[in-house]
């Protein structure tokens, strides 16, 4: 049989393994890479369990996280896969967004069923906006009783439904260890799992498809030409002579026109998501714009002062606070390119928050920031990061 030709133009999807410790997340990741490397050797390489388990440390928003990145291809897609071996690493990754997921494989051991961390991971996936979860029911080679497997599957579906995930999501029976050992029956189940990923995880919306948004990093004046702002385009596409709105930090927004777009001292007709661009804005003075504002497509974004966030508070060892904080705590919230002071309201029944905790809080900022659900922020005291969070709900 002729081999399928691999195309480099496949859709790219970010995926990850989640689930309780010792249920086989890392073994499942290793099995996927091995089985796909055996089936499509020209496009994949196999990653051993040890290589994934000894995850290198990464720093994201001042927080150290152990996380492994592997990649692989199916016939339909190219996947980047993250595996955070430790429970604390998983939580930190989800909240800081070191690796965002378009979908997740929830690994549940058939021998145990859903455990406390299984629940916690699914809840967190909901809070941080993972769009889709499907299930790998692992260690099925160790369970002979069909009825027991059905029972565990029902429990997992109930758990997904509780958090508003797809109750009808694929649940694929696997044995990651047997697949790694080369057992053909179980290798085929891993292929079935990947086919389920291809078919059930929706294609992610590309950043370029969203309305234009660029945070302002720097502002300077070019004599005789006007005011130039620089920054990295976060979303969308901007064309020369487009009208834009300048939002956030100040009471009023203002509109202007982009009369020149430059990148690396070259003139461009467009700037798109990911570009570091310099925009010349018509009729604006240097003092009309400041760092921390955003330049955006008019009418698409609104600044807010009150929101709820899911936050990870750094432990002392991670360079965080040495002491707990209480209600009405007033740190700085760093959004995109600037710090804004905010007042923290803790949930009812929570007296204080300890370094190393994961907490939901309500925040009132002293200046408005253009935000939507999912926007990430750091919590800082005197320029030092003490926490990381994500906007879960906008209140005002």
UniProtKB/Swiss-Prot annotation:
For this UniProt record, give its keywords in alphabetical order, as a comma-separated list: Cytoplasm, Elongation factor, GTP-binding, Hydrolase, Magnesium, Metal-binding, Nucleotide-binding, Protein biosynthesis
Question: G5: where is this region?
Answer: 175-177
Q: Which Pfam families match?
A: GTP_EFTU, GTP_EFTU_D2, GTP_EFTU_D3
Predominant place of localization = cytoplasm
Instruction: For the region G3, give the residue spans.
Output: 83-86
Q: Which GO terms describe its molecular function?
A: GTP binding; GTPase activity; translation elongation factor activity
Q: Which Gene Ontology cellular-component terms appear in the entry?
A: cytosol
Which of this chain's residues are annotated to bind Mg(2+)? 26
- Keyword Hydrolase attached: yes
Region annotation (G2) ranges: 62-66
Cleaved signal peptide residues? none
Q: Which reaction does it catalyse?
A: GTP + H2O = GDP + phosphate + H(+)
Region entry G4, spans: 138-141
InterPro entries named among the record's database cross-references:
EF-Tu_GTP-bd, EF-Tu_GTPase, EFTu-like_2, EFTU_2, G_TR_CS, P-loop_NTPase, Small_GTP-bd, T_Tr_GTP-bd_dom
Name the segments for region: G1. Answer: 19-26
- Catalytic activity, EC: 3.6.5.3
Q: Which CDD domains match?
A: EF_Tu, EFTU_II, EFTU_III
The protein's assembly and partners: Monomer.
Annotated function: GTP hydrolase that promotes the GTP-dependent binding of aminoacyl-tRNA to the A-site of ribosomes during protein biosynthesis.
The entry assigns this protein to a family as follows: Belongs to the TRAFAC class translation factor GTPase superfamily. Classic translation factor GTPase family. EF-Tu/EF-1A subfamily.
Query: What is the protein name for this chain?
Result: Elongation factor Tu
**Native species of this protein?**
Corynebacterium jeikeium (strain K411)
